[in-house]
Amino acid sequence: MDHNFSCKCIRLRKASNNLTKIYDSALIKVDLKITQFSTLKNIQKLGKTNFKDLSYLLELDRTTVLRNIEKLIKMNLISYKNEQNSKNKIIQLTTVGKSKLREAIIIWEETQHKYIKALGIKNYKEIDTLITKISKINI
């Protein structure tokens, strides 16, 4: 095996998985995963939204978003109902969801601060810039 071989895709996935574990471990205190937190935060950002707009904002395929929101509906954190006089379904936070999100934001901010401190602000900013660039590569 070539010991000099270093697939950046796999290395980025490993780093992403590690970071996901860090945030999931912190958010377990409020019975959420980072993906659920992100979905709730984006629903909060949009206010009342629809499935198409939420999928676009999250940059996820519709199947993944549907699977994620079904879990959040079962947890009574969001509602997904037909808009009056329309076939369009509206997604919004429930009262329970708003409360859970307030708790989760505090934990997320603490975790984010620890992550930045461990990495160093210069590295954090560089990684943020690189993530943006990597996300836009189209070859």
Predicted features, each with a name:
Residues 15, 19-22, 58, 100, ...:
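Alpha-helical linker/hinge and terminal dimerization helices associated
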Residues 3-10, 14, 34, 49, ...:
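Residues at secondary-structure transition points
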Residues 125-139:
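Exposed, interaction-prone assembly regions rather than primary DNA-binding/catalytic cores
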Residues 1-30, 77, 93, 134:
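N-terminal leader segment of winged-helix/HTH proteins
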Residues 71-129:
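Charged, amphipathic alpha-helical coiled-coil/dimerization segments
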Residues 68:
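Residues in the recognition helix of alpha-helical DNA-binding motifs
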Residues 17, 21-64:
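N-terminal helix-turn-helix DNA-binding core of bacterial DNA-binding proteins
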